[in-house]
């Protein structure tokens, strides 16, 4: 009996921990993007002088990305936990797929950026064409692919929210509007990707407050049964 009670209490604590992880993801990704934005010229064809001068700041930003990704996985976990037995296979597939693709995109961009920093810092010869190709590749991955995967994740999450009531309806409709902006983005608006971590932050704060006031019965029955 004691063992069952301990497992029950642990199950109630897990969503709260995941909600905090969503906040950590938002803070880490925002900080990483801010450091990169203030250290690297916006023009992907610009020279490497600023990159070399701010290599330590850029390295710090890149080291934040894996921890942001881990926190994002916990955030995905708490959303699924709140949906519980109401989970729909179709929307769950889009939900998981877009989340994993988004993480894959930012990790790939981070890996290429880390390689460029490593080569520039080691004194190895890197032609301007190779550097420009790396910069353009990173820019395209983040502003063409990752940003749209973030939009798809927001749409699937907002749709699930409307069907299950895991977050307020106004928050779901806000997610649709912001996702549309990400999907239609042509990459000319600097910092538009920051919309995604800020949206995750709002969802996580709501879940954290909701858990502190007592978990709702709707959509969460699978964790307590």
Language-model features: locations:
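Hydrophobic, aromatic-enriched alpha-helical segments typical of multi-pass transmembrane helices
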Residues: 1-225
């Amino acid at each position: 009996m004691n063992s069952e009670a301990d497992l029950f209490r642990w199950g109630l604590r897990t969503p709260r921990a995941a909600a905090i992880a969503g906040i950590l993801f938002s803070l880490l990704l925002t900080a990483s993007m801010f450091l990169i934005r203030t250290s690297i010229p916006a023009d992907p064809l610009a020279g490497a002088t600023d990159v070399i001068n701010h290599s330590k700041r850029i390295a710090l930003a890149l080291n934040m990305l894996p921890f942001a990704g881990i926190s994002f996985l916990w955030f995905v976990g708490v959303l699924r936990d709140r949906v519980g037995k109401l989970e729909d296979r179709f929307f769950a597939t889009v939900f998981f797929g877009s989340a994993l693709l988004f993480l894959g995109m930012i990790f790939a961009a981070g890996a290429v950026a880390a390689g460029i920093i490593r080569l520039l810092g080691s004194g190895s010869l890197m032609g301007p064409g190779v550097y420009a190709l790396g910069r353009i590749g990173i820019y395209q991955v983040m502003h063409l692919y990752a940003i749209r995967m973030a939009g798809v994740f927001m749409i699937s999450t907002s749709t699930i929210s409307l069907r299950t009531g895991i977050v307020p309806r106004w928050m779901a409709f806000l997610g649709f509007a912001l996702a549309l902006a990400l999907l239609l983005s042509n990459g000319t608006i600097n910092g538009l990707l920051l919309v995604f971590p800020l949206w995750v932050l709002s969802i996580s704060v709501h879940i954290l407050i909701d858990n502190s006031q007592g978990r709702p019965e709707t959509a969460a029955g699978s964790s307590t049964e």
